[in-house]
Amino acid sequence: MKMKPWIIAGVSCLFAGTICCGAAVCAGALDQNRYRENLHLIDQTDTPSEAFTSVLMDVDNAEVTVQNGSKFSITAENVPQNSYHVAVEDDTLQIQLNSDSEPWYSYTHFGFHPFHAPAAKITVTLPAEYRAVAIANHAGDCTISGIHVSTLSVDLDYGDCQVKNVTAANLTADNDAGDLLLSDSIVSGTASLELDYGDLTVKQTEIGNLCKVKNNAGDVRLTDVSCGSSEMELDYGSLKLQKFTETDQAQSSAFTIFDGDVHCETSTLWNSSFDLEFGDFSTIDTALYGKNTIAMDYGDVQLNLHGKNSDYNVGYSYAAGSLNDSSRNQILISGDKTVVDATVTFTE
């Protein structure tokens, strides 16, 4: 039987594609070695003998890992020989990677295959508890796990950050473009988490005092989290609190959302003010204790409150009358009644 020309052409193209793909893989592997040689990239392990109580990392472009382990070590892969420095000065372990001297093609190159120069990686293993750990990274992911520190500070420009199983007195994390995860950790003092563009996830974490969150563009989700009080500000993105518990009954909390929804589920909040311009506010089996306000510009309110009707005094600023100041738990809902609908139910 005579084979059709289009079948022959298809098989030929498939065969040619396979050859090109194999060639690309080989070329990529060669590129990896070529770039390492041309850029003087090295692998290096350091174990400074001097004692230190703080760690300072200033990295331009690398994947950074700081982890707990039984033995102190610093390992680096694919770092420029003349731009990578490790030293102990003034009781501080200093790790620096400066990419100013690297040519543009150390980050990308032209070609038909998707291979790039080898990525720099720095891994720091810390066996003890330290006074302060500060990490600054221009471009690259950052993972911090299992360490014990008094003050932890993370500042990223481009990349995702994960902080897991960490014990700290205070935590500050600032990420310009990338996601931020905080999980399975204990912060006895204040946790300040700020993002410009990215999603924030906090789960299975205890925060002793203030939980401060700011996000310009991205969603924020806190699950199984406790804190003393809260201060959260979102410009564009939704806020979801699930099994979220505030423990300080004397402090006030503030939630400000410009464009996004707020949803609370199985949570407990004290003396909270919610200010939403564009978005809906809803709760499921959530306790709003103390004096609370919900200010809406454009959006609806659906409250399912934990407890009985008699546990709360719910009022509306656009309705006749006012709240009884002697009531234990007050909720004042304000907004334009022509654009805001409010419903309130109870679990008992």
Q: Where on the chain are the PLM-derived regions?
A:
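Intrinsically disordered, low-complexity terminal regions
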Residues: M1-E348
